[in-house]
Amino acid sequence: MPYTTMGRLLFLLALAPPFAAPAAPTPDDGVTRNLTLAMPAKPITSRAELNAYLRDTPPANSPLNWLTPGAQRRFLDSLVYREHGLGGMSLADLRYELTRKQVYTLLRLFGAQDYAVDLDALTTPRPATHDDTAGTLEAAYDRLLAAAEHAEGGAQGQAISRSYAAEFAPAQTDARRHALGDRDAEFLFRAAELAFRATGQPGYLADLRRDFAELERRHRVDRPHASDFHDALLVAHRDDEARALLAAYPVVERSPPPSMRSFSRIRNGQPSLWVVTPGTRKRELVRFRFNIRAPAQVIVLASTACHFSANAARDIEADPLLRDLFREYGQWVAPPSEVTAFDAVREWNEAHPALRLGIAYDNAALPMVERVETPVFYFLDHGTVVDTVVGWPPGGNLDAIRRGLRKIDLLR
């Protein structure tokens, strides 16, 4: 959908000058050869250019060849091309199979190398003896991703749960887990992480915890595994455990987790938000009730990682009337996963004091949200959605915002 961000859309940065780097040695006949990587003179900006590169480049000369066949296919399938070039991609497989240096080189193919700088990628290259053979769970993982991609709206979580129950839950026993090969053990961990991220269900976190312990037993934990487990613990509000994990795995480059406190009784299932304590530098989130049944209000699903959300906030703040209406009747809310982005949320609130951003405690805080896209404006009358405005195009969306405000009698 144009002008919205789903998850983390990656928009490309500047092109670094081309260079030649040695490929991995190939001692097939007793001679080590340094093959020069084939790097295009300019970034690949279309599917046609990518197809030409793949056609004309021997696999051994391409950094794409550093990926296992399945990872390469998933990465290339994730590339989204826009009018002016590449507009989005998934870095999941790159994180789990390559180091930052390798990711940087590979992303130079597309002019997107800057995204490797702080990526939670491997700290050391996979050993040459690493078994790249696809196990039984890699195909199951592909089907899990397909279930997530093809599900409509609020059915995504259900589709993921069904796929996970059929193909991964049977492997979540100690005996089955121990019997898996290393790659399948990693895919089991990644599947549990995806299911927990999509649904927030505690059963998936329990699976993830056991899978992480299995990877520890095999001495297979590196930065991507520890980073994903850390973030899952924070989303599950286990800040003490996340803090302990950081101490055990300093390769996880995160700031200390905020303390999470609740000073009022909030019953299970009641909508609530995490709020950054204003006027203090304490790393603390406080949980408050969130009344979605107020007579008239605007709930804005936004993200600190979405420049469309920032543009919307800028344009609304530039209009004195809208700024005051949103200050009194608006609530900007980030998805539950942004509990991992404490510093970014605090910076947003300092930059937009009239449009302060809270973090949804869980999915129940925003029952009207079927699929996480940002920004989305929900105009509510006593909890009923009367109008919805999706996205923030280059020309803004202020007219649509005014129409929505009129429908809930906040603007004449």
Where are the model-predicted features located?
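Non-catalytic, surface beta->alpha helical segment in thiol-disulfide oxidoreductase systems
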Residues: 368-412
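Short active-site neighborhood of thiol/selenol oxidoreductases, capturing the structured segment around
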Residues: 286-313
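Typically the conserved alpha-helix immediately C-terminal to a functionally engaged Cys/Sec
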Residues: 310-325
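Bacterial N-terminal signal peptides
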Residues: 10-18
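Non-globular targeting/processing and membrane-anchoring segments
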Residues: 24-290, 404-412
